[in-house]
Amino acid sequence: MFDKVLIANRGEVAVRVIRACRDMGIKTVAVYSTADADALHVQLADEAYCIGGPRLAESYLNDDAVLTCAVKSGAKAIHPGYGFFSEKASFVRDCDKYGLAFVGPSAEVIDSMGDKDAARRTAAAAGVPIVPGCDLLKSPEEATAEAERIGCPVLIKARAGGGGRGIRKVERVEDAAKAFIEARAEGEAVFGDGECYMEKFVAPAHHVEVQIMADKQGHVFSLGERECSVQRRNQKLIEESPAPCLDGHNDIRARMHKAARDLARAVGYEGAGTIEFLYSDDGNFYFMEMNTRLQVEHPVTEFVTDTDLVKWQLRVAAGQPLPFEQEDMPVRNHAMECRINAETPDFLPSCGTVTALRVPGGPRVRWDSAMFTGAKVPPYYDSMLGKLIVCAPTRDGAIRKMRSALGELVIEGVSENSELQLDVLANDEFLSGMYHTDLTGHLYADE
């Protein structure tokens, strides 16, 4: 096992990894920007190094600065958290060059799954169902022709896209050319890659993802699934496990899990990963993408499978085999997570200083955050203040527990979105368990 790990991230995920390392007797190295000098991850780490100014390009996305700190500190591995370097293949290759273990899959796997068009083809070759569509589009004229062939509505997607960026929905064939130009431009601007492909828009649909863990010895396991259909602007708000849309459909659940494991084996996956599917009410499911990293919502899976995914990431990266079998991974109880974001009721970012913080407690209530009274919420980074996670024997019990926990949560000094979460938890469609990805559009104008 590694004796020292550098965490190439900030905020709650950096704190999460530091705590896991502490439990395992591993020393930790934090990196931080000038805006995060007093941040919690800096306070908790055994060592901390400033790597630049407040903007991401000056600090957290500065490959050379992070790698220099890792080598100088004597760290043996780098944990990327999520975002930042977690899915950057060139950074993994740099880690290899400097003799640093990267806590995640190989650069080759990240490359193959990061190209969404290539990932579709890989999934199809592995026997995993994919959404009807086409390969890379060459021109606006071809986009129009393919939209007519596939049938609207369709989605035009940047192959390097993610997080809802580089996507355009096309309702009419005559709008396909303009949408292609826009998606291509956004893909080029945000990801440095303007290549786009087209998929049929599946609606109504559920967003269901299967958690995968794989070791270097070739063992691949699925650890339940999560439903992530409560979204706004393609950003997840609430996640739960098991997926209520699969209740009574254990045959479909089993096929979905097998498809996820088959794909992970096909690409030679190592570590924690997630295969995302669209699931339609007619019982069909389709591969969307593979996230080759730890997910924000991983605590939901940890609750229902009684595992620590971060610790197993570290063990796998150190070459240890997974010591269980698939049948050792039953899903018990029901877990739910609400993302608490710093935003106004009008969905605008909220920055400032946390002047008061009261965190809910009780059995099976978890608050993952880097917030404390006096913590600064700067304008440069993701707006998530923390994640509130609960677990109960039933879904109804988990909803009640989450409502209670949200009612206890107090964050002053910045605006946050717990009222939106309570609105969702009171919605009849959500309560039925048969909600879809358009749920928040029924509650709020999504403009």
Give residue spans per PLM region.
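Acidic/histidine-enriched active-site and ligand-binding environments that engage anionic O-linkages
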Residues: 146-155
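ATP-binding N-terminal substructure of ATP-dependent carboxylate-amine bond-forming enzymes
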Residues: 1-126, 138-145, 397, 401
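ATP-dependent carboxylate activation and anion-phosphoryl transfer catalytic cores
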Residues: 7-26, 48, 71-73, 89, ...
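An N-terminal boundary/leader segment
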Residues: 1, 163-164
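Conserved beta3 strand of the protein kinase N-lobe
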Residues: 133-134
